[in-house]
Amino acid sequence: SVPRYPVYIISKGRAQYGPLTAKVFQRLGIPFYLMVEPHEYNKYRTLCDWATEVLVIGESNHGMGPGRARNACWDHAKNVLKSKRHWVLDDNIADFYRLHDNTRIRVGDGTVFRAAEDFVDRYKNVAVAGFAYNFFHVAKSKQYPFKLNTRIYSCLLIDNECPYRWRGRYNEDTILSLDVLKDFKKHKSHDQLNKKISNGKFKTHQLD
């Protein structure tokens, strides 16, 4: 099973070894787009030749933070692919898990993404959703399947009609979360987890 909505990975400065998230998607058989800056395009294109397409934002080293690349993914999903939603992920996610009976189980395909999409698509007021970090969910702690109205980082499923966009040079995940929480509810899954390097469950933002 693969995600219904397009998946994007933003990456910079990892062309030599390749983004971890892309390697995970190769193992899981998940198609994805890789968004990079112009000066690194050739390296990424050669290194990640299994990507659906390597996309390029307008300029290199613009100093505006990763929000510009995230917005470029958003525009591509909405205006080119005409998609209702899109996934956007950081490039340093080492693996994905599902939580069952408080046990983290490593996934073997994209079913966790499709399950998250199916859940979110039941509602008209979910603007942003995403997975939680696996290190917040230890085996012996009580967990609920999802959490509303909280911050979402690193792995996000975004409604393309959401009126708020990525902004700010730093902490753009937090800024988007706070912007969306003004009008929407957020949903974070606790059934699906992602394992991030140096930085899961499911979260959403919903409109009241």
Per-region residue spans from a language model:
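A short acidic (Asp/Glu
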Residues: G18-L20, Y44-T46, Y97-H100, A139-F146, ...
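Conserved beta-strand edge residues that scaffold enzyme active sites
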Residues: H39, F135, N194-K195
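C-terminal catalytic/acceptor-binding lobe
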Residues: S1-P6, G13-Y17, G168-Y170, T174-D208
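Short, well-formed alpha-helical segments that are part of the catalytic scaffolds
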Residues: R4-I30, E40-L47
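A structural signal for short, well-ordered beta-strand segments and their strand-loop junctions
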Residues: L34, R85-L89, A127-A132, H187-D191
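Active-site-proximal specificity loops/subdomain of glycosyltransferases
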Residues: V36-L89, A94-G108
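Conserved catalytic core of nucleotide-sugar-dependent glycosyltransferases
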Residues: D95-D179
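A generic secondary-structure signal
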Residues: K23-L28, A72-N79, A115-R122
